[in-house]
Amino acid sequence: MKLSIFAAIFMAFVSLNQVFGSMTHSVKSKEAIISADESLVKPIDAGQAQPEGCPVCARLGVLCPYHYRADS
């Protein structure tokens, strides 16, 4: 009985070790790592004018909670 409990715990440990070992191996491999030189998002042009008016304020007809707090 004690041997079967030990065998079950040992098999669970080996299985988890194989799963996590394969995950860390794929993370460490060069194919899985994204180069820092590559752009992941488009840059935002800060020179563009922001749209005037808040769509929430326009829809409600009153100041939204965000702008109400900003004015007071």
Swiss-Prot record:
Its main location: secreted. Induction: Expression is induced during host infection. Belongs to the CPGH1 family. Residues 1-21 form the signal peptide. It comes from Melampsora larici-populina (strain 98AG31 / pathotype 3-4-7). GO terms for cellular component: extracellular region; host cell; host cell cytoplasm; host cell nucleus. Rust effector delivered into infected tissues to modulate host functions and contribute to pathogen virulence. Enhances leaf colonization by the bacteria Pseudomonas syringae and the oomycete Hyaloperonospora arabidopsidis pathogens in an Arabidopsis thaliana infection model. This is Candidate secreted effector protein MPL124499.
